[in-house]
Amino acid sequence: MMPIIQLNADSYDFPHPKEALTEPNGLLAVGGDLSAKRLNAAYHQGIFPWFLPSEMPLWWSPDPRAVIIPGELHIGRTLRRFLRNTPYHITVNHAFEQVVHFCAQRQEGTWIGKDIQQGYKKLYQTGQAHSVEVWHNERIVGGLYGVSVGTLFCGESMFSRMENASKCAFIAFYHHFLRHGGELLDCQVLNHHTASLGAKEIPREEFIQYLYQFRNRSLKAGCWLQQVLEL
């Protein structure tokens, strides 16, 4: 078994994702901080943090990788009917900190501790992290957040407090992202929720090839301006 790399506090270098462990799947390195510079370096190499508040930062690059490829979004018949009469309206970058906070309150979001929240807040302030909000009667009832890397978007977490709210956030964002030149949506690890929307697994090596291809490209102007999205 290959040893876990301890990150150097004075360097933002990461080992190559191919050096990640197979068990636990994708564990690559430990330590470092959650500064915007380190997080940015990680995402540009296909690496993301995931750890409990009681742990040191753990850095991952799993194989396979879950993605949604343009044109492969799946919207079931029941959800399609819901979208035609949705009571929600959806925005971009109107309430980033609230979205992260609500994601952290989910049972599955217990890994989103204070350090994680502060780290992504810094990325948001530098224009690299973004949120999508779902509103109902002036209350946020769903949303998602993630990190933009060129024309690739790395989804981090989503939450829903009303029926289909997180799916509405994802679908509205998917169309918005593609209209602005988006080329790939990274879902990291496949789960039932993302699979129902059309996510599939691809080899990590293939994902890294996409990443290298897309990370230095630019989206069309205006993608991340505060705005209302259409479903």
UniProtKB/Swiss-Prot annotation:
GO molecular function, one term: leucyl-tRNA--protein transferase activity
Taxonomy, superkingdom: Bacteria
Alphabetical GO biological process terms: protein catabolic process
Keywords: Acyltransferase, Cytoplasm, Transferase
Subcellular location: Cytoplasm
EC number: 2.3.2.6
Gene Ontology cellular-component terms listed: cytoplasm
Enzyme class: transferase
Main location group: cytoplasm
Catalytic activity reported: N-terminal L-lysyl-[protein] + L-leucyl-tRNA(Leu) = N-terminal L-leucyl-L-lysyl-[protein] + tRNA(Leu) + H(+); N-terminal L-arginyl-[protein] + L-leucyl-tRNA(Leu) = N-terminal L-leucyl-L-arginyl-[protein] + tRNA(Leu) + H(+); L-phenylalanyl-tRNA(Phe) + an N-terminal L-alpha-aminoacyl-[protein] = an N-terminal L-phenylalanyl-L-alpha-aminoacyl-[protein] + tRNA(Phe)
PANTHER family: LEUCYL/PHENYLALANYL-TRNA--PROTEIN TRANSFERASE (PTHR30098), LEUCYL_PHENYLALANYL-TRNA--PROTEIN TRANSFERASE (PTHR30098:SF2)
Similarity comment: Belongs to the L/F-transferase family.
Function summary: Functions in the N-end rule pathway of protein degradation where it conjugates Leu, Phe and, less efficiently, Met from aminoacyl-tRNAs to the N-termini of proteins containing an N-terminal arginine or lysine.
Name under which the protein is recorded: Leucyl/phenylalanyl-tRNA--protein transferase
Name of the encoding gene: aat
